[in-house]
Design a protein with these regions (language model features):
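Binuclear metal-dependent hydrolase catalytic cores
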Residues: 1-122, 128, 133, 208-245
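Cap/insert and terminal regions of metallo-dependent hydrolase folds
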Residues: 111, 120, 128-230
Length: 246
């Protein structure tokens, strides 16, 4: 982890930010030579500042225990970098373009297109499919997109309502309008040239084979369902995408 230079955040929902400090700590203790950059939209300064403050005692204890030569205190403090929706980050042959995602009412919400030596990957963050999604994904080798099953979420909302659990019923119903439906992602693939589409951040989380069938149904040939530990290798000078489990 000592090679980790930065973390890109799509938005500030808890499930997308909760491990920031663990990444900071892990790379710091392994010898990261500079401060860890945390890049995100408007509000990133306050978020990173709050996380730094929250773990101030943790950093002090570790420096006191292991010594400042091993753990330089200044390298344990993360650095916030604000991105706009049209920001281009470049480092040598690596190019990362931020674009506006649609995750209402969350604003800002970003997605990213990553390009390196002729290969490209788009990461949706959490988003509906929009014209911006089509534009940024056109010609990409791989699109990683969150995916929601409308029938499954609707059934859960209705089930909670039938049990008199109105709060959970409303929460599930609210989820419907800020993740991309399976149908919209499949339609996207028919409208643009794209190498492969992988569903991740599945809603609802398919805890059994029955729920997984919602996502597997009508899956196009160049689509797949990603899982934790899955690697996508895009060899330079090729159009191949090698998918492995590790």
């Amino acid at each position: 982890m000592f090679r980790l230079d930065g973390i890109f955040l799509t938005h500030f929902h808890s499930d997308h930010i909760s491990e920031i400090y663990e990444a900071n700590l892990g790379s710091w203790v392994q010898g990261r030579p500079e401060r860890l950059k945390v890049l995100g939209g408007r509000g990133i300064e306050s978020l990173v500042g709050a996380v730094n403050l929250t773990y101030a005692h943790d950093r002090e204890h570790r420096v006191s225990h292991h010594g400042a030569d091993l753990l330089p205190p200044e390298l344990g403090i993360m650095q916030a970098v604000e991105l706009a929706s049209d920001t281009v980050f470049e480092d040598g042959e690596l190019r990362i373009l931020a674009y506006q995602a649609s995750h209402p009412p969350i604003d800002p919400a970003l997605g990213f297109r990553v390009e390196y030596r002729g290969r490209s990957v788009v990461i949706s963050g959490d988003s509906n499919v929009t014209d911006a999604t089509l534009s940024i994904s056109s010609g990409a080798d791989l699109l990683l997109h969150d995916a929601l099953s409308v029938p499954a979420v609707t059934s859960m909302s209705e089930g909670f309502a039938a049990e008199g659990r109105a709060r959970l019923s409303k929460i599930m119903a609210d989820v419907l309008d800020y993740h991309a439906s399976l149908e919209s992602i499949i339609e996207l693939g028919s409208e643009i040239d794209i190498g492969m589409v992988a569903y991740y951040h599945l809603v609802p989380n398919p805890s059994n084979a029955l729920f997984m069938r919602f996502f597997e149904r009508d899956l196009p040939d160049n689509y797949l369902i990603a899982s934790d530990g899955m690697w996508f290798d895009l060899p330079v000078g090729s159009e191949d995408i090698e998918v492995t489990e590790r």
